[in-house]
Each structure stands twice: as C-alpha cells, then as structure tokens.
C-alpha cells in the first residue's frame, strides 16, 4: 500500500494531477477540496494516498489531510459507494460539513451531489451516523504542504473547470451554466470549480 507521496507537482488537470517523485510520475486523483490547496506546477507537495487495485487498473487517490483519506476509506466501505461517488461527496463538502450533515441527518445537501438520490442519501446518513461519532473530536492534521506565496497558473480556466465538473458527474449543460454564472474575471480553474460547486450544492 502506498500511504504517502512527497514530490513535485508536475501536472494539474482536475480532478487528476501528476506528482513527480524522483523522476517517476504518479497519476493521482484528488477531491476538489484537495485540489484547491495545491501549489503551482513545479512546487513541492505531500499527499496522503490510498491505492485501489482492480483487475484492469491500479488507481491512486490523494488527499491533503489524513482525516480526508480516512473519510474516503469510510465512504468506500459503504454498500453502493465506490471511489468516484466518494470523491464527488468530498468535492462538494468539506470533511466537517459532511460530518455535520450526518449528525443532523440532513439529506437536503447530499441530494445535490451527482449520483445521490433521496433514498441513497437517507441510507448513507443512517450508515454513517455511528461511524462518525469519533470524528466529532478528531483534529485536522498533516495539512498539505504548500509553499508560501505560490500561485496557480491559469490556462483555459473555464474549460478546465467545466471538464472537472463533468468528471464529477454533473451534466455538461449544468457544468457550463454553473461556470458561466460566475461573474468575477481572471479566476483560476480551481477557484471557478469551488464557486461553481457552491452554487450547485
């Protein structure tokens, strides 16, 4: 199991990134909550990782904090929740927001996530309630390493944002509308994704 990677950010194409570790490029899929905190390409970064081995592929998932990785592991243990849905949930909600949602048994937020209907949301909340009791006092630890003053380069930011939203399960029309609704100019793709998700979830 690969539990942690430290290297140089080589590429960033939401929701994927490539981390160069001593000349080897690891393709890592990350939730948007981690993507927001990535530094510029060429900067050092440390990720907490989870490896999924399938018959046809080995998939690596990366997270800014250990508690995010633990949440991912809790989610994929649930019936009917695979890595894609787990990342969609974590991209739409911060860890603490999801914990509060489970504590309040509030389905209204979850049903806005792609792939989560009302019945699925209700089942997830019931199954997660007992599992999340220990999370109430669990501190945020091992934050992603980001160099001070790092800035993300903006290249076709709108297209990247739309592509990332589609990869999370949103329909192309929904993704385009959400990005087009953002009024501010000169935003990075990560900031566009963040604002679009806030408007959709």
Swiss-Prot record:
Which Pfam families does its entry note? Answer: HHH_5, RuvA_C, RuvA_N
Q: Where is the segment annotated Domain II?
A: 65-143
Q: Which domain of life is it from?
A: Bacteria
Subcellular location per the Swiss-Prot or TrEMBL entry: Cytoplasm
Q: Which SMART domains does this one have?
A: HhH1
Chain positions covered by the region annotation Flexible linker: 144-152
Q: Does the keyword Nucleotide-binding apply?
A: no
Instruction: Give the coiled coil ranges.
Output: none
Q: What is its main location?
A: cytoplasm
Is Hydrolase a UniProt keyword of this protein? Answer: no
Give the span(s) annotated as Domain III.
153-201
Instruction: Give the GO molecular function terms.
Output: ATP binding; four-way junction DNA binding; four-way junction helicase activity
Functional summary from the UniProt entry: The RuvA-RuvB-RuvC complex processes Holliday junction (HJ) DNA during genetic recombination and DNA repair, while the RuvA-RuvB complex plays an important role in the rescue of blocked DNA replication forks via replication fork reversal (RFR). RuvA specifically binds to HJ cruciform DNA, conferring on it an open structure. The RuvB hexamer acts as an ATP-dependent pump, pulling dsDNA into and through the RuvAB complex. HJ branch migration allows RuvC to scan DNA until it finds its consensus sequence, where it cleaves and resolves the cruciform DNA.
Please state what the annotation says regarding this protein's domains: Has three domains with a flexible linker between the domains II and III and assumes an 'L' shape. Domain III is highly mobile and contacts RuvB.
Q: Which family does it belong to?
A: Belongs to the RuvA family.
Q: Which HAMAP family is this protein grouped with?
A: DNA_HJ_migration_RuvA
| Quaternary organization | Homotetramer. Forms an RuvA(8)-RuvB(12)-Holliday junction (HJ) complex. HJ DNA is sandwiched between 2 RuvA tetramers; dsDNA enters through RuvA and exits via RuvB. An RuvB hexamer assembles on each DNA strand where it exits the tetramer. Each RuvB hexamer is contacted by two RuvA subunits (via domain III) on 2 adjacent RuvB subunits; this complex drives branch migration. In the full resolvosome a probable DNA-RuvA(4)-RuvB(12)-RuvC(2) complex forms which resolves the HJ.
Official protein name in the record = Holliday junction branch migration complex subunit RuvA
Q: Which organism is it from?
A: Stutzerimonas stutzeri (strain A1501)
């Amino acid at each position: 199991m690969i539990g942690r990677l430290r290297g140089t950010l080589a590429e960033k194409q939401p929701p994927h990134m490539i981390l160069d570790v001593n000349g080897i490029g690891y393709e890592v899929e990350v939730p948007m909550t981690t993507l927001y905190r990535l530094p510029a390409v060429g900067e050092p970064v440390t990720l907490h990782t989870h490896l999924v081995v399938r018959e046809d592929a080995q998939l690596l998932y990366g997270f800014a904090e250990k508690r995010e990785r633990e949440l991912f592991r809790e989610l994929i243990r649930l019936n009917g929740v695979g890595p894609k849905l787990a990342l969609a949930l974590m991209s739409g909600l911060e860890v603490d927001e999801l914990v509060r949602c489970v504590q309040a048994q509030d389905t209204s937020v979850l049903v806005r996530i792609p792939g989560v209907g009302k019945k699925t949301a209700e089942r997830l909340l019931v199954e997660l309630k007992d599992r999340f009791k220990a999370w109430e006092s669990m501190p945020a630890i091992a934050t992603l390493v980001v160099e001070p003053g790092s800035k993300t380069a903006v290249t076709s930011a709108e297209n990247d944002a739309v592509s990332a939203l589609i990869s999370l399960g949103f329909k192309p029309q929904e993704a385009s509308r959400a990005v087009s609704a953002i009024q501010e100019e000169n935003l990075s793709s990560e900031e566009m994704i963040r604002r679009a998700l806030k408007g959709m979830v």
